[in-house]
Amino acid sequence: MLDSFYNKNFFNRDTIGYLCDTIEQEQFQIEENKNQAEDKKKTRTLLVHRNKIKHIIKDLESFIVWVNDRHFGYDLYPFNDHDICLYNIYDPHGEYGYHVDTSRSDVWDMKLTVLVNLSTEKFTGGQFMIYNGVEYEVPELSEPGSVLIIKSFLNHKVQPILSGQRKTLTLFGCGPKIK
């Protein structure tokens, strides 16, 4: 059974630039680090309203549905204009410790975590790691434009950035709680 699925160079350099510019010009709300994430998450995160970028990410959403249908098989809700995406900016020393992605809702949960490397400059460090009985790196996410889809319940982290700036967009494939 697959833990992850990736597509290298899903977005080209021009689309990455356009997506970053669109997000950064909108001046979205900055996520407050609360609860246990406060000690783990050392990054700036903008809460991006999907409806502001849907014209740019529509092919990505179609790809997510295709990957889920063929490789994961979760019951997912359709993407919605009210969904929130996360735009993470990691500067030097920025990192995000081991965590899982989940909801506090009684009726829905996160099934898939989708990460897109939107870095517009070179960076060192920032390796994406998964722990599933053993720790391993997912080097495919290091390439700008690459997309990584993982099961949301997997422990994952971003190693500290040593130099440069790492940018990612995170979407979540959500669906009903398992009953």
PLM feature segments, named:
Residues 65-179:
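Catalytic core of non-heme Fe(II) oxygenases with the double-stranded beta-helix
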Residues 1-79:
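Non-heme Fe(II)/2-oxoglutarate
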